């Protein structure tokens, strides 16, 4: 946890903190509760949210100390449930929802000095805007968007926040609490940004699974020239309840591919966050059909809309669930791809159900345990389609990954080698589910970029 997991009461003699006390059930429980404790240690912590068996977190006191605001999920065992903002009267223990008008999960929480307004961020249609919520009636007012607001602090009638975009790392901005008079107060890395060639980006929309609207982004190569065609990097996000949108990342950043001369396509398929909870829920039990249909339709739409995309030179890349999808399309949609990149992806969903440290995740997504409903785990299991694999694949795996353990990546590479498919394995002994160390990140990008260029530029295998 971090500082958002606890809050001091205004009187300074007690605090509330979020903790999961699950014993041996911790691996399949998402039941975090809020406990109130005095600092003198004379009384045991009191569970304020024992009635909710799902996730309770992010406590914030009202200025008078009489009300506790916090974020809460409703469905036990579902880590991607919607976080609602709740208000609890501490004297009575009664709680009500404040954010009913927001259909997306609240990401963070702060309160105004007068106790009348809550501030929160939430993913929304490929971005992460900042909202002000009237505590009395729940009315939400948009304060800032045009990118992703990650952090914010309230001071008097102003809000200081960071915002990043697909073409800028985080910068500091200041706005009035009503969203007016926004101004930028920092230009971090000014010289580096000025010297960097950026790929222009655009959001697009198409009709996907169930005749519903689906969104995506295209990023032009940094060296874009009108009339030319460019190879494609088709990025598939993880989660699967996640999003690739208008925000900056020091891991999967589309500008790194645009800078190498690739055009980038990213689809927020069914299951993505920021499009309402029903949209997010739709992927559970459907890992291999609904999102695949969106990816196929989104790819076709992008090819038709953006004539600079060269479909004869395309590679698909993904991590975590994105890596699962790379394995899945290797056996179910191989035709468009010159190469694939699978980072920490699931190879065998049934084995994943026994090996991951997040049992709640696989059990929710598959509707039960692998011994109770094995057929659910096999329905969209990439291992059952290896016989159809043929596309060259780079496999990346962290040996400290307990989310999707190393045997998944090693098994993927073994299958590729056994089938005599051109493949490479990049194994990081000191990384977990993410590549976090700077030198390892450089090696990751160098290896991935070389792999993409090898298969999209006509170079002979080495």
Segments predicted by a language model, with ranges:
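Hydrophobic beta-strand positions that form the internal "hydrophobic ladder"
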Residues: 15, 65-69, 117-118, 159
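Non-catalytic accessory segments flanking enzyme active sites
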Residues: 1-23, 121, 140-225, 252, ...
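The serine-hydrolase catalytic nucleophile loop
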Residues: 229, 240-254, 269, 407-408
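Active-site-proximal cap/loop segments of hydrolase catalytic domains
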Residues: 253, 258-259, 266-462
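Short loop/turn segments that connect beta-strands within beta-propeller blades
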Residues: 38-42, 89-93, 134-138, 176-180
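Short beta-strand element of the alpha/beta-hydrolase
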Residues: 220, 228-238
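A flexible loop/linker signature enriched in serine peptidases of the S9 family
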Residues: 1-3, 18-33, 47-60, 71-86, ...
